[in-house]
């Protein structure tokens, strides 16, 4: 993986929105970088609960429905928000076009993830969007 890709993944995981902005200013394509699991900076920032970083990545054109297909789950950022019970981030992802019924590689939707991980706040949000 190129060094700039490693840097943006690390910065997204840390919630270092200034670093993410700087990297994207240098190379806009970095919003689509992937780690060894196929997770994008948007997956990473979502998983860790970094709302400001998620908002910036979305404004910079990150794919809200990207699947991390290199691992055994194949989840989208909305699956990550469901898993981590990040309701504010889930709402932002949905407002930017996230598919509330996207299926991971095991056929599970974000709603399935909320049930398994007891993510009640995200489950309630997804219900309001008629997610299954």
Segment roles from a protein language model:
Residues 10-15, 44-50, 80-86, 113-119:
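Ankyrin repeat A-helix N-terminal signature
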Residues 34, 67-70, 103:
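Ankyrin-repeat boundary/linker signal
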Residues 1-10, 96, 116, 120-132:
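Ankyrin-repeat-protein effector appendages
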Residues 1-26, 32, 36-39, 59, ...:
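Intrinsically disordered, low-complexity regulatory segments in ankyrin-centric signaling systems
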Residues 44-60, 65-75:
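Alpha-helical adaptor scaffolds
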Residues 16-24, 50-58, 86-94, 120-127:
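Ankyrin repeat structural motif
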Residues 30-31, 64, 100:
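Ankyrin-repeat inter-repeat connecting loop/turn
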Residues 4, 38, 71-74, 107:
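Start-of-repeat signature of ankyrin repeats
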């Amino acid at each position: 993986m190129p060094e700039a890709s490693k840097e943006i993944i690390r910065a997204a995981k840390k919630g270092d929105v200034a670093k993410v902005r700087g990297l994207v200013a240098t190379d806009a394509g970095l919003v689509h970088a992937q780690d060894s699991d196929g997770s994008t900076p948007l997956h990473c920032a979502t998983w860790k609960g970094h709302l400001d970083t998620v908002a910036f990545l979305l404004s910079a054109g990150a794919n809200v429905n990207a699947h991390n297909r290199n691992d055994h789950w194949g989840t989208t950022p909305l699956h990550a928000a469901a898993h981590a019970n990040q309701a504010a981030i889930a709402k932002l992802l949905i407002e930017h076009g996230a598919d509330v019924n996207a299926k991971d590689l095991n056929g599970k939707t974000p709603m399935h993830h909320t049930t398994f991980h007891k993510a009640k706040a995200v489950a309630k949000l997804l219900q309001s969007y008629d997610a299954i």
